UniProtKB/Swiss-Prot annotation:
ATP binds at K523. SUPFAM superfamilies: Anticodon-binding domain of a subclass of class I aminoacyl-tRNA synthetases (SSF47323), Nucleotidylyl transferase (SSF52374), tRNA-binding arm (SSF46589), ValRS/IleRS/LeuRS editing domain (SSF50677). Keywords: Aminoacyl-tRNA synthetase, ATP-binding, Coiled coil, Cytoplasm, Ligase, Nucleotide-binding, Protein biosynthesis. InterPro entries: aa-tRNA-synth_I_CS, aa-tRNA-synth_Ia, Anticodon_Ia_Val, M/V/L/I-tRNA-synth_anticd-bd, Rossmann-like_a/b/a_fold, tRNA-bd_arm, tRNAsynth_Ia_anticodon-bd, Val-tRNA_synth_C_sf. ValRS has two distinct active sites: one for aminoacylation and one for editing. The misactivated threonine is translocated from the active site to the editing site. Its EC number is 6.1.1.9. This is Valine--tRNA ligase. One of its GO terms (molecular function) is ATP binding. It is found in: Cytoplasm. It comes from Staphylococcus haemolyticus (strain JCSC1435). Belongs to the class-I aminoacyl-tRNA synthetase family. ValS type 1 subfamily. Residues 805-876 form a coiled coil. Pfam families: Anticodon_1 (PF08264), tRNA-synt_1 (PF00133), Val_tRNA-synt_C (PF10458).
Amino acid sequence: MNMEPKYNPREVEAGRYEEWVKNDYFKPSEDKSKETYTIVIPPPNVTGKLHLGHAWDTTLQDIITRMKRMQGYDTLYLPGMDHAGIATQAKVDAKLKEQGISRHDIGREKFLEHAWSWKEEYASFIRQQWAKLGLGLDYSRERFTLDDGLSKAVRKVFVDLYNKGIIYRGERIINWDPEARTALSDIEVIHEDVQGHFYHFKYPYADGDGYIEIATTRPETMLGDTAIVVNPNDDRYKDVIGKKVILPIVGRELPILADEYVDIDFGSGAMKVTPAHDPNDFEIGQRHSLENIIVMDENGKMNDKADKYAGLDRFECRKQLVEDLKAQDLVIKIEEHVHSVGHSERSGAVVEPYLSTQWFVKMKPLAQRSLDNQKTDDRIDFYPPRFENTFNRWMEEIRDWTISRQLWWGHQIPAWYHKETGEIYVGEEAPKDIDNWVQDEDVLDTWFSSALWPFSTLGWPNIDADDFKRYYPTNALVTGYDIIFFWVARMIFQGLEFTDRRPFNDVLLHGLVRAEDGRKMSKSLGNGVDPMDVIEEYGADSLRYFLATGSSPGHDLRYSTEKVESVWNFINKIWNGARFSLMNIGDEFKFEDIDLTGNLSLADKWILTRLNETIETVTNLSEKYEFGEVGRALYNFIWDEFCDWYIEMSKIPMNGEDEAQKQTTRSVLSYTLDQIMRMLHPFMPFVTEKIWQSLPHEGETIVKASWPTVREELVFEESKQTMQQLVEIIKSVRQSRVEVNTPLSKAIPIYIQAKDENIKATLIENEDYIHKFCNPSDLTIDTHIDIPEKAMTAVVIAGKVVLPLEGLIDMDKEIARLEKELDKLQKELDRVDKKLSNENFVNKAPEKVINEEKEKQQRYQEKYDGVKNRIEQLKA
């Protein structure tokens, strides 16, 4: 037995992970008789180091896989990383810029060499962080989204979907980043509320009779207007449908058309249509066969269709255009207006809705299959279930997916254009007469390859691959609720389309890690927390337990250093409890010496019963992914019952003369501590391995130890009830001692009036516990007691607990002291009451301050009532 006096996470964790990996503990057993359990890690981007969200995500996955391994499953936890197209390219671009060069200076091939070097560097950082977190990953199966095998899967999926008519090339409105000069996925667009303006302009009728009022937040796009639309049910405009207006500045005639898309109650009820620069306008344009006029180039500058504004930046054009409209008396008003504006997550540029020729996935048929699958036995279960509604809603409202990106880093689209005829060839391999063809320069959206992650990582498209046959479909996906649509949904429809099976059985969704004040963590706010710093200070086990138990499924988690520290204190409590137990168990006691059939004491039977109840609770809650509740159950059992009560109670036989009883106590201590370590292991892998190795045990590592199961022969319901009665009596005596300022070191007479003869006999049989915890000078247990005139009485389940006060305290002095305390409490109550009844304070003070005052009021009132009650007792 080698345990330091104080828990030191650095010493406990040093070298442990390397030992696990070296011994292949995390590799699947591949025992065909075992049921499989698979989780593929959501691949982190190779753009940088892992943040707290990653730590939370992977901790939950590791808890599940460690638990399943202990439950006898052939478990695979597969690692991997994502190439993260635009994000990584932006990082490499920035690095090149520091050297005074751009990717255009060095060309595509050389740039990709730099990108691969970046990937290798940051992949190494990520693996180091996985190790620090203690993740039970099988590194022999690590994958990367640009691996040859995964690239082959990507090409096959693209070609198959193209041949089915689901992938097509066409013109549609996409999110365009004018700075990075690429299309963006919706998740790469960050919407921020911006103080802008609502511009109201006059569009004169072509016949010269008045004007129609049009409002817009983007005046520069009006240069591409091709129509005005009104709602056919709007009585104000029934007579003008079919008429024409003149587009200001440009002079082009625009028809006034009827379309039910228009909101009658918004603005003037008339809307300009710019099909090439707004997704909704594009749909209207398609319905009415309107011309698509693009007025900007890919850099966000006005093109030659913008007439005299050609060459101006879009925002400069806006200013100039408004001034020109003012000069022509065509501005009705300009209102201050806060509206949501999309910004590129990478470049920060304002995203432009832009008509562009891109590659798209036709989503309706794929989404419908996903929806239909949720009505079958192959359905996917969402945790919490409410997120299934979110999934269904998004699938019902889905639009076609832009999958091409104007980048160099990524899966180059497997499409070639004939140099002479312009014919398109799409194939998994390049055309044989390659000299006559040029490949599409664009790459695929990162989400395209990550949508194949659950099956491409296991060997697909080779459906005979051993891993694909054995470990697919996977069992659980653990990820954040913010990417249900962007990633979860896409994995589901690709899995169904290409494997005819759901890619995973369960989806466990967690929230975001927020700062302690509830704000989102971000670099700009400077409130981010590096998980490696937390591990350095408190250890991986403290961070893991906090992350896993700090919230319920689907909810956000507020990071708190204080709470991580409290977990450290919990582990230190476990450490001290284990250390005491091991000192009493002794080095001579072996695993085979554990015998729970001997003469078990009441405390032994109680702790074994509570252990079995905790095993059942923890196992059942874990199956539902309710790790917050699991944490509470473990904390209460280990801290309150095992450490604070049973360990103290075990000192009675261990300090006694009965060797047989000592041996039984050693068995119970050893067995209970062993089972606690096993339950805690998925949450705290490092410290549990350290303690378990010091315990009498079978096997080489707790990683491969079996999960605890309920043993009915070790459940003693009657003993549990008896112990509950004893604990209540002990707590009552201790509380009464506090109330009359009598320390535990001072022996006092204690009377217990039992409800009946059975309870009396049980209490007498177990009075050793009362002697140890209450220090009576004289202990009387009977069914009838003459209660002294001056005494403190507490009603408990077993009857009454009576403490005579005569000679214990000076009654007059104690009453005077308590009355003085009561007076002080009354003054505090008056002060708080006055504050909370002040309307000015209640209306102006922050909610947090008001709540603090209310909490004070409640505390003072409880103290006041308690002191008043004690005075009445003493006077009685």
